């Protein structure tokens, strides 16, 4: 039978002498620590087995290490264990419990860290080593060696800026007086004889309770009414909450966050008791009573507080605790609710105060508006009274304008808010009709321009720059022009003859910057253009003595592209008239020349090729070249059209009908013993008949060079019996001179092209300089010969309006907006140029 159980301690561990054997019996320690996952198995030493609970433990021995067990100290003296049997763990626990209740507290019961540590000595411990264990050596004379030196430390400090009597540091923030020490009265622990703070410490650091002291005091006062199971009397400490703390708590927990709201709806199953309980929020768990389960033995309800003993629970009344806690919670909620109500009332007072200030301002504004409206009403009633037929002092147009100026200057807001259209219709329109009653626009085209300009600034709505009849109800000035001024214009246009265009053009030029754009468009499209179209249809170029351009071209600045539909019938009628035309009749050039810049280049060239060039070719084909008797009329008739037809068309006529006959005559002349001086003059004479632009053409240049080559071959071939003296030299000189002129002309042309390229490069470099979008549009308008100018007094949403040809535009943040039928449409610059052409 094994006797290992005799050496087992109360915790079920085996002594170090038999560490290779272990008993698997279940002890009380195993039952108590069954559910303790952090339990540590402490192997009992020989000293613990000998002395039991009175064994002295060194803190160094209990320090955890990486090894499974502590290494044996073979330098320690040998100790012997007396024979005998150890008591069981249960008996030792009972003895310890009985001793704890009766025995007084001794110094050995305190942890060994609070008392002097005993030094265990053995037989082999040297006596010389015992002096280090009893205590520390006195250091009263420490630093006495300084008085035998030169004081180098003090000198070094003074070199670094130290001033005697002041603290160390950059700002002298160090302490001056050394820290005072206070000797403890006895050998007790810290705080056993009262406060140990010195007078200097109390002055520098006033007494303030730490958080740990406050927590200990709170735990004592909290459990004052309960009896301690251990039997010792403790002073309870209560927790107090101020009203401010409750208010702060109420402000923080006023609104639940989203996760808290979600957790408040979570279903919780409590399986900690004998029965399964279901809660529908985590808050219900906090209100659960701490009542022990019925039917369980008292021992199973008590949880051990330590590994060796279990502390009995105190006297508990969960129902009373719940009621008290409920009363406390209700009181806290009432305080929090009252605080919230008070804050709400204060906020309401502030809000009402601001509302009162705002309403006071609104009331003052309304009073001013009422006062101004009353004055405006008086002025309007005065105008209405003077508009009556039986009034002795009738209202004039100038006086009415002054009244409206007063309304606009002094009562601007009321004037803009009022219905100006109805006011103008009732007062201004009758006076305006009376003013223009005897007006004849063709005789006095500037009549009424000043008065209408004044009323334009008074009545026109800047926010509604309308250009269509649908906006008449929103703009008083547009309605005034349409209903009062426009009937006189319609009446006079119906009586106007289109061939007498100057009075009508002057009239519209005088009013173009005053009347709205859409009204001007209506006059040109609906009144003027139909009259011109009808007159063009009745025009006959063979019988009419008045040229058509004399009464069509004056309309170009106003109508521009609107006249495009008239050009096709005009070209058709001119083409019919030129069927029997001969180049000897110069009247055709006089009729066609004004239309060269009006027609597009393509249509003009097509018209010339179809109707003029064939006639000139026939005339040039009839030309007879005779050096002895030359008739130049036919040649002059053709050359006279040089500016009207293109250079390529003229050169084509010369190549086909002139140069073959001219070279043939030259060859015949050279083959009959000619006079080379006369041939030279004849050559230079014909060449002088052409302009530089024609001579610069490569085909013409080749023909004249061919004539020079023929002349050189004639003088160098010795044809004939007689050769004129100096003829060869003269022809050679002529050839050299002509070639030099051609070379100089080509060099001059190249120089001009280089200069033009340089100018274009300068222009491109200048154009690379940042400019605004308006400057770019202006540059493009100049390049394409399009009129670009601002419309005086016209704005749309605060943006200046411009006329780009016949199109009305405005520019907003680098975007061009073109007036459409009802709205403004953004467009590109190239599309704008195409529309303007």
Curated annotation (Swiss-Prot):
The UniProt entry lists the main location of this chain as: cytoplasm
Q: What does this protein do?
A: Involved in pre-mRNA splicing, specifically in spliceosome disassembly during late-stage splicing events. Intron turnover seems to proceed through reactions in two lariat-intron associated complexes termed Intron Large (IL) and Intron Small (IS). In cooperation with DHX15 seems to mediate the transition of the U2, U5 and U6 snRNP-containing IL complex to the snRNP-free IS complex leading to efficient debranching and turnover of excised introns. May play a role in the differentiation of ameloblasts and odontoblasts or in the forming of the enamel extracellular matrix.
Q: Highest taxon of the source?
A: Eukaryota
Residues of the region (Required for nuclear speckle localization) are 710-734
* Pfam family for this entry, one: TIP_N
Recorded hits in PANTHER family, A to Z, give: TUFTELIN-INTERACTING PROTEIN 11, TUFTELIN-INTERACTING PROTEIN 11-RELATED
For this UniProt entry, the molecular function terms from Gene Ontology, in alphabetical order, are: nucleic acid binding
Please report which protein family the annotation says this sequence is part of. Answer: Belongs to the TFP11/STIP family.
**What does the UniProt keyword field contain?**
Biomineralization, Cytoplasm, mRNA processing, mRNA splicing, Nucleus, Phosphoprotein, Spliceosome
* UniProt-annotated stretches for the region Required for interaction with DHX15: 1-50
Domain G-patch positions:
149-195
Which residue ranges are recorded for the region named Disordered?
1-21, 53-72, 85-133, 179-236
Q: Name one GO cellular component term.
A: extracellular matrix
Assembly and partners are described as: Identified in the spliceosome C complex. Found in the Intron Large (IL) complex, a post-mRNA release spliceosomal complex containing the excised intron, U2, U5 and U6 snRNPs, and splicing factors. Interacts with TUFT1. Interacts with DHX15; indicative for a recruitment of DHX15 to the IL complex. Interacts with GCFC2.
Instruction: List, as start-end ranges, the regions of compositional bias called Acidic residues.
Output: 91-102
Q: Determine if Nucleus is one of this entry's keywords.
A: yes
Task: Output one GO BP term.
Answer: spliceosomal complex disassembly
Q: What is this protein called?
A: Tuftelin-interacting protein 11
Compartments annotated for it: namely:
Cytoplasm; Nucleus
Q: Where is this motif: Nuclear localization signal?
A: 700-705
* Phosphoserine: residues bearing it: 2, 59, 98, 144, 210
Listed Basic and acidic residues bias regions: 1-13, 53-64, 103-116, 217-231
- Keyword Glycosyltransferase tagged: no
> In the UniProt record, what gene is named as encoding this protein?
TFIP11
Q: Which organism is it from?
A: Macaca mulatta (Rhesus macaque)
